[in-house]
Amino acid sequence: MNDFPWLTTVVVLPIVGGSLIVLFPHKGNKTIKWYTYCICFIDLLLIAYVFCYHFELDDPLIQLTENYKWIHFFDFYWRFGIDGLSLGPILLTGFITTLATLSAQPVTRESKLFYFLMLAMYSGQLGTFSSRDILLFFIMWELELIPVYLLLSMWGGKKRLYSATKFILYTAGSSVFLLLGILGMSLYSSNEPTLNFESLTNQSYPVALEIIFYMGFLIAFAVKSPIIPLHTWLPDTHGEAHYSTCMLLAGILLKMGAYGLVRINMELLSRAHSIFCPWLMLLGSIQIIYAASTSLGQRNVKKRIAYSSVSHMGFLILGIGSISETGLNGAILQIISHGFIGAALFFLAGTSYDRLRLLYLDEMGGMAIPMPKIFTIFTTLSMASLALPGMSGFVAELIVLLGIITNQKYLLITKILITFVTAIGMILTPIYSLSILRQMFYGYKLFNTPNSYFFDSGPRELFISISILIPVISIGIYPDFIFSFSADKVEAILSNFL
């Protein structure tokens, strides 16, 4: 059974299953929804089965490899494989997409197209994390752009077309740099074009050329991560998108950029990364403070959460730039942690909007009394976002900071400055998080206004919220579960920097 193409099945199942939605009757909304849930859940079960029975945790090498000749003309392979770096994002993708699909139940307009796009996006994201061919990586990277654009432009707020256009201009524009970098790396060979990740890992380049490649990939991944100043598409996109789409953006899409930085910039271009890592740490430090302080000035609750995501991604950039085992493990943990927390906060903001039809914080207030369940869950996940001990966010950010402090590559004054700046960001985080709670849930503004939408969480919403809360607490208490499959791969990546 080990020869069975498990990864191809996992990647292809959602988009193939989604293509069959066209066969359903036009008015079968409920049938289409349950069919989509089943596709996502079956795929998640397949991912869990492959992880439990076919993946060796103590093996840092690529496992479950699949290698099929696809296009003979230029030696292009359908090549998949996973290791400790890709396993966490794949599990996160399956989990968040399944819950995001369940959260999209209120969507009734053009539901066939909506659920097909979600499944197509699912396949693209899984393919990106599983690819072992750099051109296949690019194809999967681009595959999820079109579904996201259509989800943004067709289901969202009044300015959805503007935000969708801004999203596609940023991401498609940055993809040009990604494609040029891929073509340059694959063609720089004495014999024949090389697209295999394993071959590219052993490829050496002149320093100047490696820096050019590195900058091209950095621009592409900085847009998706996002890294300032290439982040401005994110608040507009989150502010207008349907909250199920926001869950996929915050939970998975942002993590693709961080994954690319580690998989390509660190693993394939280690010399250039050594040159750029101090600048990455500087950018990460500035990003934490800038995004946290900007979040305080946002009236729109979804934009405030979006800027908080940008701030938390700053810790991830710090971990990647630290070139230390502790720091990089912390960055990988932050990928998983923020994937859960960011998706949960956007889901709760969206469910509140379903009831109140309000997004501006200064128009809200008094929700705690009529909606105690939403209030309790929102408060708990806000505590996770501000890195409360016992939650996954605390462990991830603490480990990143420890990776910087214990790193011998940087001067003491540099470590003190970075720690001081990030500490300011960590002080600003509870200010904007608690401000959201105060403006939404306390006071009497809405409580004294008769409103037919004032009802608390139902079983579906409670199930989604608790399903995300459980791993947030579990990782906070026992982060070694994540480190058990990432630590060996991190050690292998950092061996290139010795």
From Swiss-Prot:
Keywords: Chloroplast, Membrane, NAD, NADP, Plastid, Plastoquinone, Quinone, Thylakoid, Translocase, Transmembrane, Transmembrane helix. One of its GO terms (cellular component) is chloroplast thylakoid membrane. InterPro entries: NADH_Q_OxRdtase_chain4, NADH_Q_OxRdtase_chainM/4, NADH_UbQ_OxRdtase, ND/Mrp_TM. GO terms for molecular function: NADH dehydrogenase (ubiquinone) activity; ubiquinone binding. Its EC number is 7.1.1.-. The keyword Cell wall biogenesis/degradation does not apply. This is NAD(P)H-quinone oxidoreductase chain 4, chloroplastic. It comes from Phaseolus vulgaris (Kidney bean). The gene is ndhD.
